[in-house]
Every structure is written in C-alpha cells, then in structure tokens.
C-alpha cells in the first residue's frame, strides 16, 4: 500500500507507505492524473488525508471511512469552526492573543507592498483586532462579527468599541485619536476588504461557524484522525 502509479503488464508500480512521502504528478487535462493515480491511492491509503477536490470528482469516487466533506456551496454541508482553537483556551489573555493572530492571517502584509499599502494594512489590522476582541467576548460568532464590522463606518464602530469598554480592544484603537479622518477611513476600508467575503457571500456565511443544531462543525484537529475533502467548484478557482 502507498502511492499508486499504475500497472504495466502483471506488475504494479507504487511508492510504499513508509517510502518517500512527496510525489508530484504533471500532465495535461483529462490524461488520468486523478483516475489512475490519486483515486486508487486514496482508496488504499491507511492514514488520513486532506484533499482539495475540484468539482467533487475525487470525493464521489473514493469510498472510505472517517470521511468529512466540507462544501461551501452546499448549505447542508458541515461547518468550519474558525473559533474552535480560540474557544478552547482557558484565559481571556490567551484568547485575545489568538484573536490577534487571526487578524494577522486575515490581513497579511503582501510581498513588495508599497509604504502606503503597508500603512493601511497594519493600521487596518488594528481595527480588525480590536473588533474581534470586542465582539468575541460578547459571544458573537465569526461571521456575525464580520457583518458587524462591515456594516459600520469607522466612527460608529469606534464609538461602539469605546462604549463596550474592553480594555484590551481599546489599546488597539486609541492611536487613531486625533489622526486624519481620511487615513482612518482608508484603514477601515482595508479591514473591510479583508473580511467582506465572510460578511456578504451567502455560501461562505452558511459554511463558517460554531456547531449548530443539526449541523456539526469541522475543526483542524480532526485532520489527525479523519479524511477531509474540501470541495471547490471550477468557477471559484480565480476568486
């Protein structure tokens, strides 16, 4: 058992499970990469797997146990719980630190970014971090927080953060006091751009969140014991 390459005559060619773990396969469209190599390998693989499945061609043809299918275009699909690891942390300080790390993931610095772009990203990330901390500790879920942020201008958002009076959150936005309204609006726009998909796309909104009644949620820890398939439609690859 291992990575299956195919058959020639009576001989089967494969890389055993305990052999080299990295294999790349390059070929034109429709030449059998999925059907002759990937699907047979997944069918006989003893370990777990994480599969990005374009249009469901792989998932529909692999019958294995412990399979989780995450399909953002399917309203009945399992959810992805982005807050799972944060919810598990015991102290508010640890949760706040994790929320700041999440803001970094959502608003990373681009390579070769201009000084102006860096400014708006870094300062916009402060707004996002303050908002995540404020609304997370109010019990909101991720999509709900994104909707709350995007629906408000920077003045209204800052007023709400100030009124809720979470000390840690306030530390991220006090530096905006007395600064240019135009620059602050630009920072808020950068924040909105980073999370707009989660606040406005109906498919994404229905696929991200904590477990709900009748709907389980997938969490990263399950990669250690489950076979996870992420289904993405061809048309979404350029988004």
Regions found by a protein language model. Name each.
Residues 1-16:
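N-terminal pre-Walker A segment at the start of P-loop NTPase domains
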Residues 19-239:
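P-loop NTPase motor domains
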């Amino acid at each position: 058992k291992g990575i299956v390459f195919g058959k020639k005559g009576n001989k089967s060619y494969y890389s055993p499970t305990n052999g080299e773990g990295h294999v790349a396969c390059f070929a034109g469209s429709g030449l059998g990469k999925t059907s002759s190599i990937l699907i047979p390998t997944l069918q006989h693989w003893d370990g777990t797997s994480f599969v990005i499945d374009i249009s469901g061609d792989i998932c529909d043809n692999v019958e294995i146990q412990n399979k989780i299918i995450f399909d953002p275009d399917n309203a009945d699909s399992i959810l992805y719980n982005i807050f799972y690891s944060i919810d598990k942390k015991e102290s508010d300080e640890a949760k706040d630190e994790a929320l700041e790390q999440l803001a970094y993931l959502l608003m990373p610095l681009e390579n070769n970014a201009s000084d102006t772009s860096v400014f708006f990203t870094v300062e916009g990330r402060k707004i996002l971090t303050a908002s995540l901390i404020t609304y997370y500790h109010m019990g909101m879920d991720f999509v709900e927080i994104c909707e709350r942020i995007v629906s408000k201008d920077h003045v209204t958002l800052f007023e709400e953060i100030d009124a809720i009076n979470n000390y840690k959150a306030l530390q991220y936005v006090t530096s905006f006091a007395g600064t240019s309204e135009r620059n602050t609006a630009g920072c808020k726009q950068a924040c909105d751009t980073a999370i707009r998909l989660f606040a406005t796309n109906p498919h994404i909104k229905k696929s991200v969140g904590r477990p709900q009644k009748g709907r389980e949620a997938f969490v990263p820890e399950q990669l250690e014991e489950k076979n996870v398939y992420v289904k993405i439609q061809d048309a979404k690859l350029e988004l």
